A protein has these predicted regions:
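Hydrophobic alpha-helical transmembrane signal-anchor segments
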Residues: 1-27
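Small/polar-residue-rich segments within soluble enzyme cores
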Residues: 23, 78-85, 97-207, 521, ...
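Short extracytoplasmic
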Residues: 35-63
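Short, small/polar residue-rich loop motifs at catalytic or cofactor-binding pockets
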Residues: 36, 41-45, 180, 234-238, ...
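Short beta->alpha transition motifs characteristic of CBS
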Residues: 60-65, 157, 252-258
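Beta-lactam-recognizing serine transpeptidase/beta-lactamase-like catalytic domain environment
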Residues: 189-199, 245-285, 290-525, 562-569
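Conserved, well-ordered alpha-helix/loop/beta-strand core segments that scaffold catalytic motifs
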Residues: 194-238
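Short, gly/Ser/Thr-rich active-site loops of penicillin-recognizing serine hydrolases
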Residues: 438-443, 537-569
Length: 569
């Protein structure tokens, strides 16, 4: 019996040995290999972002991260002590990160991130068991705050992957990020690569780069100008937009306050968006240009149409006055615009009618996004004419009771400057792929809004604004003809309702005879001065002067005779 039992045992052992040596050898070998092999992600270089001349605004940088496999670290205290001076960290902090619960079998812990390759090499030279180095994505913004509201910033998303968190970094994230590579290598139990071990690699594919329409120096000047204006007027914020009316190219888009995308803190949160595209405000008198355009284009007025302006009018039970008290005045239509008369504008809008005015507002792009495709862009608010109250039908003609973004209003004036043709604003001029092929961003065909004659007449009327006869002599640019309009809008109070404070602005273009540049300045709730001609016009003058000089725009040779504005003189 014992002999039979022994034979049976030997038979089972033999079968098992045969299984180990033959049938399962490949399986166990594969398992052993899998335990030795590690997969490392090779981050793709994120594409650069430059201005129109190729100056770098955002670029990829090679960074390293130091990690630990706590299960392979034998001497936690000693390892922490050796790493501390290299990583510029405390021994105690590193010791805490290395100390994990054995029951949890944690095999990956970051010890330091965002390191330069030099620091990573020093860590590697220590030869510490259980400590490894991995590549990671890095992003740097050489000019710091310059155009940060446009470029955006980066954040750590799902899986701790660095991705666009705002602005163009977000809008073009898939274009910029590229495709990561992979590396499979053989390592010993301590996590250290075996030099003679097997290794397989798939190269990363870099992301594409963006060339913007921004002009670095014009952007820099606009940022400084709006920041200075916000500070001196004690405003809550401000924005400046500079455009080429012929192409829709945005040469500058500046906000105040700004932030540094290299080092974002909690206090930067309110500044992380883009005021020019996000914030809608009641534009006030800069909107009068649309009312005038509608009347001119329909042949209802000319620049010399006589207008009788009483001290006040009442519409829908609301008393409407001009900014300065006056008796009965006799102005031309050009004078109504130059003096920014609310009363005269309402009377002209009533010739156009509600439906006609709404059509004009929408044809200029109000009530809809501009087509820039910028993250968080707003459309403003333009109610349908059928829903306007009696007072709203009047106030909308001079920019109260509706809202628009700064970019929308800049586009309105660009349309006039472009002979009545509206073009879509652009921020990205071209995309360069990893293969070096440059693809210029196509510009949709322009849309005619008003006739070329209407645009020309309106331009002449707007020239009178930036003179001693108008509301903005401080907007004059020596040597150039400037066409533009002031705005001093009441600011809605989101907490208590009604209005509290003001939003002064100035929008204009130059040279008036051959427009090359549109500049818009908007200040939010200034405490020292609030008229557009007082606080916004000087900022316009500073930004416009610099832009014209930077672009080498020639001065006009002749100037036309001034328009008749006041029939009482």
């Amino acid at each position: 019996m014992s002999i039979v039992l022994m034979c049976a045992v030997l038979s089972v052992l033999g079968l098992r040995l045969t299984q180990l040596q033959g049938f399962s050898a490949s399986t166990y070998a594969a398992q052993a290999e899998a335990q030795r092999l590690r997969t490392i992600v090779l981050p793709a270089a994120r594409g650069a972002i430059t201005d129109r001349a190729g100056h770098t605004l955002a670029q990829y940088v090679e960074l390293r991260a130091v990690y630990a496999n706590p299960t392979n670290v034998r001497d936690i205290a000693g390892t922490a002590a050796k790493l501390a001076p290299v990583l510029d960290d405390s021994t105690e902090a590193l010791r805490r990160r290395l100390t994990t619960d054995p029951a949890e079998h944690i095999k990956f812990v970051y010890l330091a991130r965002g390191l330069t390759p030099d620091v990573a090499e020093k860590v590697s030279a220590l030869g510490l068991r259980g400590i490894g180095i991995t590549e990671e994505r890095g992003r740097t913004y050489p000019s710091r705050e310059l155009a940060a509201n446009v470029i955006g910033f980066m954040r750590h998303g799902d899986g701790d992957i660095l991705e666009g968190g705002g602005g163009l970094e977000l809008a073009y994230d898939e274009v910029l990020r590229g495709t990561d590579g992979l590396r499979r290598l053989e390592a010993n139990p301590a996590g250290i690569e075996i030099p003679s071990g097997q290794s397989r690699e798939k190269d990363p594919i870099p992301g594409s780069s963006l060339r913007l329409t921004l002009e670095r120096d014009i952007q820099w000047n606009a940022q400084n100008a709006i920041a200075d204006a916000v500070r001196t007027s004690e405003a809550d914020g401000g924005t400046a937009v500079v455009m080429d009316p012929r192409t829709g190219d945005i040469l500058a888009m500046a906000d105040a306050p700004q932030f540094d995308p290299n080092n974002i803190t909690a206090r930067d949160t309110p500044a992380l968006g883009n005021r020019s595209t996000r914030d809608a405000y009641e534009p006030g008198s800069v909107n009068k240009v649309i009312t005038m355009a509608a009347a001119l284009d329909r042949g209802l007025i000319t620049s010399e149409t006589p207008m009788t302006i009483p001290p006040f009018i009442t519409r829908g039970g609301v008393r409407i006055e001009d900014s300065e008290p006056h008796g009965v005045e006799h102005l031309t239509a050009a004078g109504v615009l130059a003096r920014s008369s609310n009363i005269g504008t309402v009377e002209i809008s009533e010739r156009v009618g509600r439906i006609g005015l709404e059509q004009a507002l929408r044809s200029f792009g109000l009530g809809a996004r501009t087509g820039l495709n910028f993250p968080g862009e707003g459309a403003g608010l333009l109610p349908a004419a059928r829903d306007w109250s009696g007072s709203q039908a009047a106030t909308i003609s001079y920019g109260q009771g509706m809202s628009a973004t700064a970019l929308q209003m800049a586009s309105v004036y660009a349309t006039i400057a472009n002979g009545g043709v509206r073009v879509t604003p652009r921020l990205v001029d071209a995309i360069t792929g990893p293969d070096g092929v440059v693809k210029v961003t196509p510009q949709p065909p322009g849309q005619r809004v008003v006739s070329a004659q209407t645009a020309a007449t309106l331009t002449r009327m707007l020239e009178a604004v930036a003179t001693n006869e108008g509301t903005a002599p401080l907007a004059e640019v020596p040597g150039y003809r400037v066409a533009g309009k002031t705005g001093t809008a009441k600011r809605p109070d989101p907490v208590h309702g009604g209005y509290q404070g003001y939003v002064p602005s100035f929008i204009g273009f130059a040279p008036a005879d051959d427009p090359r540049v549109v500049v818009e300045i908007v200040l939010d709730n200034p405490k020292k001065g609030y008229f557009g001609g007082q606080v916004a016009a000087p900022v316009f003058q500073r930004v416009m002067s610099f832009a014209l000089t930077t672009l080498g725009v020639p001065q006009p040779i002749t100037r036309p005779a001034p328009l008749l504005l006041d029939l009482d003189r």
